[in-house]
Curated annotation (Swiss-Prot):
Coiled coil: none annotated. GO terms for biological process: cytoplasmic translation. Belongs to the universal ribosomal protein uL22 family. HAMAP family: Ribosomal_uL22_A. It comes from the Archaea. GO terms for molecular function: rRNA binding; structural constituent of ribosome. This is Large ribosomal subunit protein uL22. Part of the 50S ribosomal subunit.
Length: 151
């Protein structure tokens, strides 16, 4: 039996939450995107994610910097398009949840955002002489909590 844990942070007052479980995206890209968006107004975060998908804005990397090239005006950074599409879905979902709860969607601020390692899919590829090579894929859980605040 799997006992599901809730969100990793509980907030008092008016807030909205959203979560994506077991997304097939890179953990390293997701951690860096979440770090960059934390504390940002939701409208600005959506603009940044759209620009990353169009490859006009690079996400600055603060972790997993090995062989990450510098981008103009950013430092080490990349354009993680696949992870950005998952974050776009997450941001739209939390905005709809906030609208349903009656919050003012123009003043939403990202209070908490996290990317955590989820379930691992184990695959084995047959090789020569009866051996098998392991191919493990980590799935990622994303969560976000927004509150009403001033920009």
């Amino acid at each position: 039996m799997i006992i599901m844990k809730g969100y990793s942070m509980e907030i008092e007052g008016n807030h909205a939450k959203a979560r994506i479980r077991e997304a097939d995206i890179s953990l390293k890209d997701s951690v860096n995107i979440a770090h960059h968006l934390r504390g940002m107004p939701l409208s600005r975060a959506k603009e940044i994610i759209d620009a990353v998908i169009n490859k006009t804005y690079a996400i600055p990397y603060f972790r997993y910097l090995d062989s990450v090239s510098h981008r103009p005006g950013v430092g080490p950074g990349r354009y993680p398009v696949k992870a950005a599409k998952a974050f776009k879905q997450l941001l739209e979902n939390v905005e709809n949840n906030a609208e349903f709860k009656g919050l003012n969607t123009d003043n939403l601020v990202i209070k908490h955002i996290a990317a955590n390692k989820g379930r691992m899919i184990k695959k084995y590829t047959p090789k020569a002489y009866g051996r098998a090579g392991a191919n493990f894929k980590d799935l990622i859980n994303l969560e976000i909590i927004v509150t009403e605040g001033s920009e």
